[in-house]
A protein has these predicted regions:
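Short histidine/acidic/glycine/proline-rich micro-motifs that form metal-
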Residues: 8-12, 39-41, 103
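Short hydrophobic segments within beta-strands
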Residues: 6-8, 35, 133
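Active-site and donor-binding regions of nucleotide-sugar-utilizing enzymes
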Residues: 12, 17, 74-133
């Protein structure tokens, strides 16, 4: 079995969870890889999003952006969250990465990759089991 753990470099909590899961799976002799999902959209983008996220949590900007996204989704029932739409934008590269590397299971420890995986699942483009922790 080959397992992919998807995280994001937005603080270290998610990466710590990913490492704990990986360590447990390796003890079970399961092939396991951790990937920064945003790096699939580009290393530069990954760095910028990480810096913006860390800045926004310090200034409470993230809380307000999250509330705005939720309000948009609730007000316009057929419109997905802006965050979901953004995460869907790199789902093609994520799908290619999963297929090219032959992963059997995907574990997401962050909302961003979970939303990208959800977009792929909704379109029926990937069949591998996906778990969101």
């Amino acid at each position: 079995m080959k397992v992919l753990i998807l995280s994001c470099n937005t603080g270290e909590g998610h990466n710590s969870a990913a490492r704990a899961i990986r360590n447990h799976l390796i003890e079970q002799d399961i092939d396991c890889t951790i990937t920064d999902t945003l790096s699939l959209a580009g290393e530069s983008l990954s760095r910028r999003v990480s810096q913006l996220y860390i800045y926004s949590t310090r200034t409470n900007l993230f809380k307000y952006l999250y509330k705005i996204g939720t309000a948009v989704s609730e007000f316009l029932e057929k419109v997905k969250s802006p965050v979901f739409l953004w995460n869907r934008s790199y789902s093609d590269r994520l799908e290619e990465f999963i297929i090219r590397n032959g992963y059997d299971v995907v574990i997401c420890v962050h909302l961003f990759p979970a939303e990208a995986i959800t977009a792929l699942k909704l379109k029926g483009r990937i069949k591998v089991p996906a778990i969101f922790v």
